[in-house]
Amino acid sequence: MCISSYNYNPIIPSRRLALFHFASSVIAIPHSQSVLSGIKGSELFRVQEANAAEKNLFEWIKNDNRRFLHAVYRVGDLDKTIKFYTECLGMKLLRKRDIPEERYSNAFLGYGPEDSNFTVELTYNYGVDKYDIGNGFGHFGVVVEDAAKAVDLIKVKGGKVTKEPGPVKDGSTVTAFIQDPDGYEFELLERGLTSEPLCQVSLCVGDLDRAVVFYQKAIGMQILHRKDNPEQKNTVATMGYGPEDKNTVLELTYNYGVTNYDKGNGYGQIAIGTNDVYKSAEAIQLCGGKIIREPGPLPGINTKIAVCLDPDGWKLAFVDNADFLKELE
């Protein structure tokens, strides 16, 4: 019922007492005040309900079965890159496919089966033999038993070494840096045997605190460690879905004073497995991320995905876990 200011007659309380219900001692509340209280109460209920739903969503993210599936990037000569990765880095070619109607081919390589290991997905677009990597992509990390031996082999095979093997500053781990035929950089880390040799993806960000919060809340990662390096003028946060010695991690690097990066057109995205792409997309939007492909099945293969951009514009694709396993059958 609408209450009009023209026909509403408020009760004016006496000097001694407002209207008093003699039997129950209950103070009568003017009708307009009770309606307003009801409106405020319903609004409060809706806010509380929304907050509870948001809390439940972020709790779901913590328990979602997430892991890194693969990194996607473009190469100018697929066969040449496959040869380099298998002969110099010890990867295995897991599968390869050609899509002539869309004028591209791709290959998946890694150190173990795709259903349990992180891999790289190389994409070759017909007729394109060179890509701009930009300055925002950092490197991939690969665990090796002997960095010096690995570097010697890469030199023999004609690979480019950008940093000779040596211990990291303030540490004992021996590392080296090399480039693949397209200029993508790989850090070789001398460590013990691991179930996940393709251990790291490094990206540059313009605001580390903002990025860490986004990857924690929206993407469900844990911050494993954070280190400030004044001599190198950068701060690095390492994030992932489990211990660094058993899982691939994401390394976010903030270089002092640099807030924007050229991402080029070579590096594509990281794919992450999830039990529900729709809930994943909802969480990303709540945290300020941008959805660039709405959640739903891909034409032809029916694998459900959702694609978003993080606050720095790096692309992430969420892939339905069950659908991904069906792809591998």
Model regions and ranges:
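Glycine-rich phosphate/pyrophosphate-binding loop shared by adenosine-nucleotide-utilizing enzymes
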Residues: 120
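Eukaryotic phosphotyrosine signaling hubs
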Residues: 68-70, 135-140, 198-200, 265-270
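Acetyl-CoA-dependent GNAT
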Residues: 124-126, 190-191, 254-256, 321
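N-terminal secretory signal peptides
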Residues: 1-13
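Polar/charged low-complexity regions in secreted precursors and cytosolic/nuclear IDRs
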Residues: 79, 98, 110-116, 127-138, ...
